[in-house]
């Protein structure tokens, strides 16, 4: 690797490629790797040969599941690419990729425009304030419409698009693009050398008026941002390409607007100008805000880490992946300082020492060893034992904890039973490894049945995890039916509930008296439980108060309606009493547990279920059937709109009603409709449905 790229961070771009499933994201990444000289044969997704899709299931299903990190070079600049999945079950992968990126390329299907998952990923990028450029792909596709797609970016995403290119031709006759900055045409003729050569030409006469119109819009928009440019523009002078680029770069990095480019990655057209745009408009590590962390053990003390080799070392682990030879690869983004392979660092999140065995820069699943990791770059580390996703690694003398990531709770679970005793041991290893890799994959043991329960973000998510257990860990197991993660909550407050725990059996007994109030708590911000110590006058000794809290939390693991975990409760300890000899932490914990149960019974407990935001895109002929079917699944239709010759139906539907939906939708629409769904919120289960669930749980 060129030394100047390591030290000159203006020549580094850490980017993600983000999109809806099937918008052509992996193909676009493949073309980038081809033109930057890393891939000699282009891998096609539909051949199962794409380089970035390196897990066996990805190559079979043609969708990207794991964000592999890849390094390549273009025009003297190093581009580190994180490939992100476009399927909603894998939002955790998208979330953790965006957290460590400086910029992104949003890929859109030129026929479909903004699709449901494009919207989800866009919102996640907004959350982390990631600057973006847009690539309208598949311009060779039947029905492709560049201006329709640009319109959906504005209408559905509420973003300001800035057109930087115009397509030359469309569908089969798509031949290239008009570059509005330099006012020239770039054309790719035929398949010679896989699109590596393009011709710079005069703008075709039939496009000249349109090109002048959009060039004027571009110049006017950038002139508004700078007084010197505005003066020049109002004086009738044209702006130079360099002036336009500098102004667009500034606007893009501030996320004020989003430059739009177009092409067809599959047909090898338009990829190189998009790579130029990555360098011209997306930020280097020096252009983004410095990383803010906090002191270990004290979140109120802020510590800033700048992307500089002279700063103390700090890095964030954003992905853990199993590797066939090295055991475990930990992907990190280094935010400050330098660290050499073989060094000892501290996992400041967990307070554990770690030794970095080897360091690599990755090309998909191939490793390129390096001697040291430097600020602003992305690496894979070997040898870290304790580190998991979201942990901070830092210099042991100057520790810092960087802002971590938030992951959604799983909404679906299945029971899994190993077929033989040998499988039992292998299952344990498989589950441990997979849980290290994926924070949204959770495991628990059902105390009553002894079954292992695995939980995830959707049916596809669990399917793939089970598939990986079979392939990678050779576990043969029976998998049960998917189960919904119900919750329980309360609908009204109970102002006073007393409980006395008293036990006398010779010797010292047990005594604890508590009085609590409970009230419903809004869970919209992710707070599911709050404990308030409102005891006055030392009626409950201070050392026993955490025990009451622990007892209440333990009771919340099992609700009174059907035994599902309780959420949305604010509990206040308002009074109580202790005995000098017989009181203990255990006595107060038991009292806390029992008083909550009693109070919840009086607080109108109800069952909650996960509700999914469902979007169905269907030909108009099947609209009635699709809506009727969603209504029959207790769905609430939120909206219906026209999109590129089809209808888009948005609805909220309980997850329990969505099992097997893919097959039903296929048969109702002859395979012509597509849908996506993701978790939206928890809502109260209607009484008649709740009664059925309770009966089932009780085995009636």
From Swiss-Prot:
The keyword Magnesium does not apply. InterPro entries: EFG_II (IPR041095), EFG_III (IPR009022), EFG_III/V (IPR035647), EFG_IV (IPR047872), EFG_V (IPR035649), EFG_V-like (IPR000640), EFTu-like_2 (IPR004161), G_TR_CS (IPR031157). Keywords: Cytoplasm, Elongation factor, GTP-binding, Nucleotide-binding, Protein biosynthesis. HAMAP family: EF_G_EF_2_B (MF_00054_B). GTP binds at residues 19-26, 83-87, 137-140. Residues 10-286 form the tr-type G domain. GO terms for cellular component: cytoplasm. Catalyzes the GTP-dependent ribosomal translocation step during translation elongation. During this step, the ribosome changes from the pre-translocational (PRE) to the post-translocational (POST) state as the newly formed A-site-bound peptidyl-tRNA and P-site-bound deacylated tRNA move to the P and E sites, respectively. Catalyzes the coordinated movement of the two tRNA molecules, the mRNA and conformational changes in the ribosome. NCBIfam families: EF-G, PRK12740.1-5, small_GTP. Belongs to the TRAFAC class translation factor GTPase superfamily. Classic translation factor GTPase family. EF-G/EF-2 subfamily. This is Elongation factor G. The lineage of its organism: Bacteria, Bacillati, Actinomycetota, Actinomycetes, Kineosporiales. GO terms for molecular function: GTP binding; GTPase activity; translation elongation factor activity. The keyword Lipoprotein does not apply. It is found in: Cytoplasm. One of its GO terms (biological process) is ribosome disassembly. Pfam families: EFG_C, EFG_III, EFG_IV, GTP_EFTU, GTP_EFTU_D2. Its main location: cytoplasm.
